[in-house]
């Protein structure tokens, strides 16, 4: 933000805004009323994210093993993220997880989670058997909108109050709890 003349903000201000689109994040953080200014901030963020920001991601302890077991048990895994698809794929590849996922759906400035899920459903996703697993209320709300079950997780960027308030079908406090929720292999 500083490189475009905006005041730098503390991580504590950014963290609660992670999840919705970058346009929402920057409209909240920057004193900028114009769409053009927001788009410049988004472009600058993506420039840095594409060069090094993606590599700053970290895996949560136990997630690779949980994902591997879910996949081995016949669950079809997908990613529905606010990140652009190319960034999400690069992150999955960086961690050696890309082969576990059937699809990656990415967001954009004008594409939110609800729109992403609507597109996935129109492309054949069965909402009656799908489960959205997410760390933010926006994930749970998007699932509710489309009649998809949801599991809120308490690791990541959301917190207990936010997740509980969004009313997911289940709440997991640790990654391996997902294996308890989805213990039966898919036939």
Listing of model-derived features with the role each one plays in the protein:
Residues 132-171:
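Acidic, Mg2+-coordinating phosphoryl-transfer loop and its flanking beta/alpha structural elements
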Residues 7, 97-102, 126-127, 169:
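Conserved H-loop
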Residues 51-79, 85-89:
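Short, acidic loop-to-helix structural element flanking the phosphoryl-transfer center
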Residues 105, 170-174:
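Short acidic-hydrophobic, aromatic-tinged amphipathic segments that line or gate anion-handling sites
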Residues 113-141:
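Conserved Lys-Pro-Asp/Glu-containing loop-to-beta segment of HAD-superfamily phosphomonoesterases
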Residues 98-112:
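A short, structured active-site edge motif that brings together acidic residues
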Residues 1-16, 30-35:
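Active-site neighborhood of HAD-like aspartate-dependent phosphohydrolases
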Residues 21-35, 91-92, 119-122:
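Helix-loop "lid/cap" segments that line or gate small-molecule binding pockets
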């Amino acid at each position: 933000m500083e490189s475009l003349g905006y005041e730098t903000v503390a991580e504590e201000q950014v963290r609660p805004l992670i999840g919705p689109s970058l346009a929402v994040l920057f409209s909240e953080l920057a004193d900028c009323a114009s769409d053009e200014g927001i788009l410049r901030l988004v472009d600058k963020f993506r420039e840095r994210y594409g060069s090094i920001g993606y590599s700053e991601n970290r895996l949560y302890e136990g997630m690779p093993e949980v994902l591997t077991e879910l996949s081995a048990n016949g669950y079809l895994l997908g990613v529905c993220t606010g990140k652009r698809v190319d960034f999400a794929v690069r992150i999955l590849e960086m961690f050696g997880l890309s082969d576990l996922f059937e699809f990656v759906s990415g967001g954009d400035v004008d594409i939110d989670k609800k729109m992403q899920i609507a597109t996935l459903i129109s492309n054949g996703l069965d909402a009656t058997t799908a489960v959205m697993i997410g760390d933010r209320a926006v994930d749970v709300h998007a699932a509710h909108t489309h009649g998809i079950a949801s599991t809120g997780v308490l690791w990541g960027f959301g917190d207990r109050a936010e997740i509980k308030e969004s009313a997911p079908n289940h709440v997991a406090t640790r990654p391996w709890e997902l294996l308890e929720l989805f213990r039966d292999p898919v036939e």
